[in-house]
Curated annotation (Swiss-Prot):
Entry-linked HAMAP family: PurH
Top-level lineage group: Bacteria
Sorted UniProt keywords: Hydrolase, Multifunctional enzyme, Purine biosynthesis, Transferase
Listed InterPro entries: AICAR_Tfase_dup_dom_sf, Cytidine_deaminase-like, MGS-like_dom, MGS-like_dom_sf, PurH-like
Organism of origin: Rhizobium rhizogenes (strain K84 / ATCC BAA-868)
Domain notes: The IMP cyclohydrolase activity resides in the N-terminal region.
Catalysed reactions, semicolon-separated: (6R)-10-formyltetrahydrofolate + 5-amino-1-(5-phospho-beta-D-ribosyl)imidazole-4-carboxamide = 5-formamido-1-(5-phospho-D-ribosyl)imidazole-4-carboxamide + (6S)-5,6,7,8-tetrahydrofolate; IMP + H2O = 5-formamido-1-(5-phospho-D-ribosyl)imidazole-4-carboxamide
Every MGS-like domain range: 8-158
Record protein name field: Bifunctional purine biosynthesis protein PurH
UniProt entry tagged with the keyword Transferase: yes
CDD domains: IMPCH (cd01421)
EC number: 2.1.2.3, 3.5.4.10
Record's keyword annotation contains Zinc: no
Length: 538
């Protein structure tokens, strides 16, 4: 049975007479304390916050003087006391509460300014287990929740950005706060503690390798509100979860306008793809449009990798996202600015490249500092009506797979390299996906078709168009390897690829008609390997 409310109406305005200040982030706290003191507000504080306020020459009472109980256990216990929580939770207009306060010597607290131990920062910095645990705040969330629950009478501030609005209210209304303000701050406070607890719970789940905990909460901090979402009629915002994975959420915007919803989605897809190509194996470039690659290539230099990626589908690349696995240099920047591009993302950018990109002030340039490790899984989430689908990120790499040759002819060394390249790209193409590749360059990409045969045909058409644009006599698919991100259910998909000129095929295998497909490959002297790993992408 639910707890029954006495339904005492909340007052519109409450006089702030006593404030409790206990913060880890001391940004603006001394200035706030001084302004409150000048308005006649009694200040209570704890630990380092008390020291900072007292050092500024302000009158402040240590909470231990109020509780008559010292701070103990390295600060783990200092505010968990009835005289603190009673002062925060007491309903001022309830006679029984007032009697209890009088009997136990509890003074009301009208303002709670609290922020928390930096658990997120310690986790992000890779702190060891004991240090991370020690930075789980207990007293802070308890006080925030207590004061926010009693927002009818108590104002709760958890963000230094709200200090100025509080002071404006107090100045405009003879030291009082409005119910609307208290309610808004309470909502913000509960959102803060919810996100904080979610990060802790998720950290424990990761540490214990629990993929499906009984309760899964994905918390985030608002990074920015956007003009609109995927379409102009949709509202949107970008939240960061604190996951320590290099990418669009950790990148620095060196120039250009605010990233849009679609920019962020596409840039994330681009950077995750290019991270599959380790820098020690050479420069690589991926060009993305609508979260699908339209060209991916490696090269002896970064500028050559970009040129080769662009050549795969220069028409679709217009207005796309460019992701690089190496430092963006001047030569590559000079080529990129020749084409309209929405976003460039790279681990680093040289000063010369920055100056060149600056010629296009609307071009968004992101520097990340590192590439994400493609072998680290992490979590991905997708909302459905009334639910949340959560899974480990697809961290299966073709380099780690046991490739099984299933045809009479084994692939040549070059075909095997082309197979791996194509399968690496196919992992990042919307299903059904078919990718042709040759000599470290995509030759044609077929994405998102309901029929795998149609994806193969589209990829072949793209290859023909690219060959014509490059002035080549035959399509890029001649002598190429072809990858399918899922098994070929019938021989028709294979025959379509063979007709386009492919001589080697890589696919997961596992169809009831595998033998039919293998027989067709043998009949045409095509080499085929099974990976045993599927890469569906929806």
């Amino acid at each position: 049975m639910a707890v029954v409310s006495k339904k005492i109406p909340a007052p519109d305005k409450v006089q702030v007479k006593t404030a409790l200040l206990s913060v880890f982030d001391k940004t603006g706290i001394v200035e706030l304390a001084r302004a409150l003191s000048e308005k006649g507000v009694r200040l209570l504080s704890t630990g380092g916050t008390h020291k900072a306020i007292a050092a500024a020459g302000l009158a402040v009472t240590d909470v231990s003087e109020v509780t008559a109980f010292p701070e103990i256990m390295d600060g783990r216990v200092k505010t968990l006391h009835p005289k603190v929580h009673g002062g925060l939770l007491a309903i001022r207009d309830d006679a029984e509460h007032q009697a209890a306060m009088k009997e136990h010597g509890i003074e009301g607290i009208d303002l709670a300014v609290i922020n928390l131990y930096p658990f997120e920062d310690v986790r992000k910095a890779g702190g060891d287990y004991p240090t991370t645990v020690e930075n789980i705040d207990i007293g802070g969330p308890a006080m925030i929740r207590a004061s926010a629950k009693n927002h009818a009478y108590v104002t709760t501030l958890t963000d230094p950005a709200d200090y100025s609005e509080l002071l404006e209210q107090l100045s405009a209304d003879a030291g009082q706060t409005t119910y609307d303000f208290r309610k808004r701050m309470a909502a913000k406070a509960f959102a803060r503690t919810a996100a904080y607890d979610a990060m802790i719970a998720n950290w424990f789940a990761e540490a214990l390798d629990i993929a499906t905990p009984r309760h899964r909460v994905i918390g985030g901090v608002l990074r920015e509100e956007m003009r609109y979402g995927e379409n102009p009629h949709q509202k949107a915002a970008f939240y960061v979860t604190g996951e320590n994975r290099p990418g669009v959420s950790t990148a620095t915007l060196l120039q250009g306008k605010q990233l849009s919803y679609n920019n962020i989605n596409d840039t994330d897809a681009a950077y995750e793809l290019v991270a599959e190509f380790l820098p020690e194996n050479g420069p690589a470039c991926a060009i993305i449009k609508h979260a699908n690659p339209c060209g991916v290539a490696t090269g002896p230099s970064l500028v050559e990798a970009y040129k080769r990626a662009l050549a795969c589908d220069s028409v679709s690349a217009f207005g796309g996202i460019i992701a690089l696995n190496s430092i963006l240099d001047a030569a590559t920047a000079e080529e990129i600015v020749k084409l309209f591009t929405e976003v460039i993302i790279a681990p680093e950018v040289t000063e010369e490249a920055k100056a060149i990109i600056a010629r296009k002030p609307n071009l968004r340039l992101l520097s990340v500092g590192a590439l994400p490790d493609p072998r680290v899984a992490g979590l991905t989430a997708k909302t459905v009506s009334g639910g949340l689908l959560v899974q480990n990120r697809d961290n299966a790499l073709v380099e780690d797979m046991e490739l099984k040759v299933v045809t009479k002819r084994a692939p040549t060394a070059q075909e095997l390299e082309d197979m791996k390249f194509a399968f690496r790209v196919a992992k990042h193409v919307k299903s059904n996906a078919v990718v042709y590749a040759k000599d470290g360059q995509t030759a044609g990409i077929g994405a998102g078709q309901m029929s795998r045969v149609d994806s193969a045909r589209i990829a072949a058409i793209k290859a023909e168009e690219a060959a014509k644009a490059m002035g080549l006599a035959e399509p890029l698919t001649r002598g190429s390897a072809v990858a399918s991100e899922a098994f070929l259910p019938f021989a028709d998909g294979l025959l379509s690829a063979i007709a386009a000129g492919a001589t080697a095929v890589i696919q997961p295998g596992g169809s009831m008609r595998d033998q039919e497909v293998i027989d067709a490959a043998n009949e045409h002297n095509v080499a085929m390997v099974f990976t045993g790993i599927r890469h569906f992408r929806h």
